[in-house]
């Protein structure tokens, strides 16, 4: 959920104004983004940089994380690493100064207790904040484990009400 919200909110408008389908002509732009415990990126290279991880360890981690019946993880990894695919999914690299305000809250543990904990690590919030600040995107970030707590807004509800009133 949180990653999908970031992908949609940070993507360029996908409206197809020439479509005969009324739904496809609608804008996909949002007024604000709320992401709770999401990752900073879908790009494997960005993840490896964040946690200083080798390809071998990253592949091992993904293989353990994606262990589902019928899932061909090796095939998934090959497709996932394709540059064209990475460019299409990585909302971190989509970010630009035209993006809507965002609230990012990450309350994960500093020491991951499981493989899925990496997806919810507070450092993701730090990376999103740094990127948003560098692009002058209005942002409110809460990652208490890292000492990051926006003082300009009193949480998710205040953020949502602020975005809807503007």
For each feature predicted by the language model, list its residue ranges:
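Stable alpha-helical elements in mature extracytoplasmic
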Residues: 1-5, 26, 87, 91, ...
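Short, proline-enriched alpha-helix->beta-strand connector loops that line the catalytic pocket
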Residues: 26-31, 96-102, 135-137
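Primarily recognizes the serine-hydrolase "nucleophile elbow" in alpha/beta-hydrolase
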Residues: 1-52
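Mobile cap/lid helix-loop segments that gate and shape the active-site cleft of serine hydrolases
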Residues: 10-14, 44-94, 100
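Surface-exposed acidic, glycine-flexible loop patches that form ligand/cofactor-binding
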Residues: 23-27, 92-97, 164-166
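Structured segments of extracytoplasmic/periplasmic soluble domains
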Residues: 7-11, 36, 94, 131-135, ...
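C-terminal catalytic histidine-bearing segment of alpha/beta-hydrolase fold enzymes
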Residues: 102-117, 122-166
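Conserved long hydrophobic alpha-helices within structured protein cores
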Residues: 1-12, 95-107
């Amino acid at each position: 959920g949180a990653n999908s919200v970031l992908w949609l909110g940070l993507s360029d408008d996908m409206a197809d104004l020439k479509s005969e389908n009324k739904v496809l002509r609608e804008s996909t732009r949002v007024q604000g983004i709320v992401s709770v415990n999401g990752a900073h990126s879908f790009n494997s290279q960005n993840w490896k940089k964040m946690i200083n991880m080798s390809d071998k360890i990253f592949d091992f981690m993904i293989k353990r994380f994606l262990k589902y019946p019928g899932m061909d993880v090796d095939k998934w990894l090959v497709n996932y690493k394709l540059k064209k695919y990475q460019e299409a999914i990585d909302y971190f690299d989509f970010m630009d100064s035209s993006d809507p305000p965002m609230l990012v809250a990450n309350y994960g543990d500093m020491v991951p207790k499981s493989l899925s904990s990496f997806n919810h690590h507070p450092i993701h919030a730090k990376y999103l904040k740094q990127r948003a600040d560098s692009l002058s995107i209005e942002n409110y970030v809460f990652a208490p484990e890292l000492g990051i707590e926006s003082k300009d807004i009193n949480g998710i509800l205040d953020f949502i009400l602020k975005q809807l009133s503007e």
